[in-house]
């Protein structure tokens, strides 16, 4: 079966036509409730084995709050809680994604729940993952697991029963993505293109400084050793400062080899980030180490972050040893 993506306007039209007086939650002013017409619900559903779990991971990366295997009847209470309690506003989460399949309790109540959400003015959309019967059979055979609706019968029987149960939901879906010929990376790109209009083009970068004397980091994609630079610890006027203080930063960055190292490392990171974006890796951690994690590594981390931000990258910085002092 050929790859296919379908975009429909059913969900958006229903939200637009909702009564104006039902589009705002009630709450105390201190709770800062989220207006219902500013809240979004996404249902992730489709054929078992078509990629729902991976789709949920991608949607979570897009900023949605994801709940797996949620009974449809709990959607309304959950939306009400996230809007009227103010928790959505405080956390910045205004988008709820629920993974629902035919095994969810009270699946037959879904149509009524969707109608209720439409009446409330909540923008509700459906992402449906599909694949051909032949591909689904191959996928199940490769993992040697039974289909959830197989019930001791043939695998194809379970697939056909599920396809029949999901017919109406597929017709209502805003996006139908056929994953028959898609790899995991291609599915990710397809989801970004369908839901955001473009694929993931940047990688979020976190840089942290550390001290080798306190142990090597275990969660870094890159580790830079800057102990080749002169150590400000041995300069009495700089010892009690950190790499975030200008005198220390000036001392470190003006040292022989600092600029050349940063130039080369910046270029290497740029090349790697371009490749990571193509390989569907959206988060990269860079560790920069010196002896105690107070001076050289901090100054170099801050400067590397400044350079990468100049390229439009989303970069955060932290100091692992910030609570340790008097360390070289």
Swiss-Prot record:
Disulfide bond residue pairs: none
Signal sequence region: none
Source domain of life: Bacteria
Positions bound to ATP: 46-53
Matching InterPro entries: P-loop_NTPase, RapZ-like, RapZ-like_N, RapZ_C
Gene3D superfamilies in the cross-refs: P-loop containing nucleotide triphosphate hydrolases
Keyword Aminoacyl-tRNA synthetase: no
Binding positions for GTP per the UniProt entry: 101-104
Biased composition (Low complexity): 13-29
A Pfam family the protein falls into: PapZ_C
Disordered: annotated segments: 1-35
Residue ranges of coiled coil: none
Keyword annotations from UniProtKB, A to Z: ATP-binding, GTP-binding, Nucleotide-binding
GO molecular function: ATP binding; GTP binding
Family per record: Belongs to the RapZ-like family.
Functional note: Displays ATPase and GTPase activities.
HAMAP family, per database record: RapZ_like
Entries under PANTHER family matching the protein: RNASE ADAPTER PROTEIN RAPZ
Protein name from the UniProt record: Nucleotide-binding protein BL0705
Protein source organism: Bifidobacterium longum (strain NCC 2705)
Lineage: Bacteria, Bacillati, Actinomycetota, Actinomycetes, Bifidobacteriales
